[in-house]
Amino acid sequence: MQTPEAGADSTVSTVPLQTSVPVQPAVSGQQVASQVPVQQQAQTVQQVQHVYQAQVQYVQEENNSVYTNGTIRAYSYSEPQLYNQNSSGNYFDTQGGGGSAAQVSTVVSTHSMANNGNGTGALAMGLTGGQIISSSGAYLIGGNSMDGSAPHGAAQTTRASPATIEMAIETLQKSEGLSSQRSSLLNSHLQWLLDNYETAEGVSLPRSTLYNHYLRHCQEQKLDPVNAASFGKLIRSIFMGLRTRRLGTRGNSKYHYYGIRVKPDSPLNRLQEDMQYMALRQQPVQQKQRFKPVQKMDGVSGDNFSSAGQHTPSAAEQTFIAQSQHHQQFLDGSRALPEFVELDLGEAVDGVGPEDVKALQTLYREHCEAILDVVVNLQFNLIENLWQTFWRYSASSSVEGVTITENSGLSEIEGRLPRARLILLCRHEAVHKWMNTCDHLMYQALVEILIPDVLRPIPSALTQAIRNFAKSLEGWLTNAMSSIPPRMINTKVSAVSAFAQTLRRYTSLNHLAQAARAVLQNTSQINQMLSDLNRVDFANVQEQASWVCQCEEGVVQRLEQDFKATLQQQSSLEQWAAWLDNVVTQILKPYEDKPTLPKAARQFLLKWSFYSSMVIRDLTLRSAASFGSFHLIRLLYDEYMFYLVEHRVAQATGETAIGVMGEFQDLNTMSPANIDKDEVSEMDSDLDEEMEEADEPLAKREKVEADVIQVLQVGAMEDGSSAVVGIVQPSMINSLPPTTNNHSEHILSTGTSTIRHVGNTYASV
């Protein structure tokens, strides 16, 4: 056993914990009298320096004596007695004389319980916390808590007892020469530490951050702080088992305490957020350079610069960096931003020159790269600031009564592209289309960074952070663009809404995948599912679903057999994913390189969902024991099918998955006909009658709103319905002189075709 001076990083020895461990020492009455009674164990603490197999040595102030162990006597304890947690956790025997009082010596040590799989465990005695309790007949090492139910080692740091706190104060008194008056103040310091910090695995805090928090506390309470070295000893005496690590980039690394964090309900969390917010607001974002994470920000003036001109991260920044490092291993930080297409206005715009168009392209590229950088570093709260800077949001903000003016980086951007010219460009339809395309590329890259594999386990804290980020996006962007033309706002919000919805869907899919993984790994559940599935009357299911789905009977039977075979093989989640991907490939193969693939893909999703719901209904009516497992699997497979199909459609159309989903996001500016493009001919029979009376050619357009025109091709689908060729804005159409028969010809700005306008429809000439 080691002394407290050995340091928290020392190797912990392991002593097997058995049900018969008392030892009978040869202790004289005088020596027993010198011990401290159990009732007073919180007042006196004695350190045990060494424990040998045949000897027990007590380290006392005056006399160090070694006593030979006596005859070992066996005691029986039940498992509930041994492993249940209670306030003391001490076991001792009072044999040998009714009048002898039990004695206690507190050992400074940590505890960890390792389960070896057969119901027994080993207790590791480390550096502080256990107790050796003696009576007339035995000594027993007792721990504060043990966990024998865990399937793996449950080693963790523990918090000090009141006796250990007093010992820490006494140690500081001796080592630092503190007066009794100053040492009495340490109680409040220690209580503050216990109220605001807790031990946790996988996290760290910079040593400077803890000390800065402590200095702030002392300043607020008008207390005299101890120096940094004494504070470090105080931390280690309270939170046992802390390790020290040096984290950070080369030349700018800092020492961190590993295994401690700020409590979630501590006011220090708010302090850290405010410090980071203030540092950000004072940071002029230099758009001509790629925006870097907090620890690499350029342009901060004042005391945060070292003599070499490099930015020295503040304590709050270091804390944020350290806490994000654990989650960054789940991201794909190697992904770069794709190249953007060139912006071509097609015609001159009054008040805007070619240099302004070039400046917009350059600034927006740098803006998107900055967004990608902060997302890679999980600094989601910086996105709002980047948007406000680019879109010239100039309103002042207030934090706790302090008015903060926006950073001076606006002037640098204003010099490259004045706000008035930016607004002129934002009114041009070509800029809307170009920026929408750029946004889809950027948001798709962000999705693949944050969730590179939807089936890979993601920490719940990271999942929640992503979902909170998605929830805030639309509000941040709308607020930042408050002075921008509404049409541009609609374009931007449509893209960011698709991005937010994709993040929500993918995190939900990931959550379902982890829940289903446990089911697929359970052999008994799989066997029960297979047994219940074999009782389903699939012929009856096919008969009921055939009128709605109109699926080929051979395809349905093949899918049924493949599903049962895959289930019987007890396939893993990844194997099921490969099977689902193969199903999508087989179903969509006849539509490859055809414009009808998007509709065929959507129809497949509807049919898959309807057919699977019929199977679930049959299982429900039969009261299948595995109904819950099937319901979970069905939810996962439906969602994963959606994921696969949207990527197949994106690949076939040359769009991103975000772009495919973005077609349906802007519901405020699109009519219901635009939401269900493939069903326009069924939804508007009046239009069909009008077109028949006018005897129009095969291609037609329906002007459903003043600002949206749909391009339809009559009879293009196998069932005779009309396929949607595309959507254009009226501003892209240049009117020509009217022709005979009351027809008005128009030519698209893109030069794709010539169309004829009749009433509220457009038809090709």
Swiss-Prot record:
InterPro entries: DNA-bd_RFX, RFX-like, RFX1_trans_act, WH-like_DNA-bd_sf, WH_DNA-bd_sf
DNA-binding region(s), chain positions: 189-264
UniProt keywords, alphabetically: Developmental protein, Differentiation, DNA-binding, Nucleus, Repressor, Transcription, Transcription regulation
Subcellular locations according to the entry: Nucleus
UniProt keyword Manganese, yes or no: no
Bridged cysteine pairs (disulfide): none
Keyword DNA-binding: yes
Cross-referenced Pfam families: BCD_RFX, RFX1_trans_act, RFX_DNA_binding
Gene Ontology cellular component list: extracellular region; nucleus
GO biological process, one term: regulation of insulin secretion
Single GO molecular function: transcription cis-regulatory region binding
Function, as annotated: Transcription factor required for ciliogenesis and islet cell differentiation during endocrine pancreas development.
Similarity annotation: Belongs to the RFX family.
Protein name: Transcription factor RFX3
Organism field: Danio rerio
Organism classification: Eukaryota, Metazoa, Chordata, Craniata, Vertebrata
